[in-house]
Amino acid sequence: MKQFANLHLHSTHSDGVYTPEELVRIAKNEGYRALALTDHDTVSGNDEIRAVCEREGLDYIFGCEFSSPWRERRTNFHIVGFDFDPEYPEMKEYLAQRSFCEAEQTRILFERGLAEGLLHDITWDEVLDYNRGVTWLCNNHVFNTMKAKGLVADLDYMNFFHTVYGKRRGEVKPPYESKPIDKMLRLIRDAGGFAVVAHPHNKLDVIPELIGMGLSGLEVWHHLLTPEERLKALELAKVNNLFISGGSDHDGLCGGYYSSFEHPEESEFYVPECSCGTQEFFFREIKTRTLHSEREAVIEGCIDLEQNANY
């Protein structure tokens, strides 16, 4: 099913491959007509992508992806917050904390890598300088700086990641904790936004509980959901009046991870063009924050299309 809007994207402002401007160009060429940049715990790229979308004639909605634990269930959720005010005091403070945590963890492991001889011929100041304007600094930003200096090539990434970062990230305790799921949902709402659960492929059974905490929607067309899970998600959205979202995340052309493959369909990151995202009808609901009376019939039509495609 060809999608209209791609509402789950990552840029170089978090752990994505492309700049916001590059993302718009690639998404437009692929066929998308509306976008949301949902970088991890940061909104530093949103002004840029909004401006480029306006210039290129694409629709846009403000977004960010947060990670929240649900300790009682011993699991973690990714929550996309849409259309909130990043200047709302508590949200502004939380975004600053999350960026500081990521950058500080990255810096500490970077310094350990230097001390242990795992890294060389690079300084933290060079990482900061190369990634100006980025506040949420992760291992990708270190690697990209090294690549720009000619110290590594793309094929070196996995060895770099597992040697310098990888499981070692657990050795560095963050100075601030992520907000648990109930408090994260409340903060997004208090900041004037609404929340959608990202790629709920193995968490659909707890959606009713999350609705009670303030969840407003869920992703349906995301590569991690099986055909059966997409059908279940559509039914949940219909019965519970939930917004329907979706996006390519780190996969597909916008993910950037199979651009070097001669045959992209051989990559684990491959998805058919414009297959992840959401339909124009559901995007308009999200954009206007209004559920339309004909949505049940539209959802039933999507269910029929999904069933016919799968059987």
What residue ranges belong to the model's regions?
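Generic signature of intrinsically disordered, low-complexity segments enriched in small/polar residues
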Residues: E21, I26, L35, Q97, ...
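Generic detector of intrinsically disordered, low-complexity, polar/charged segments
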Residues: H13, Y60, H78, K147, ...
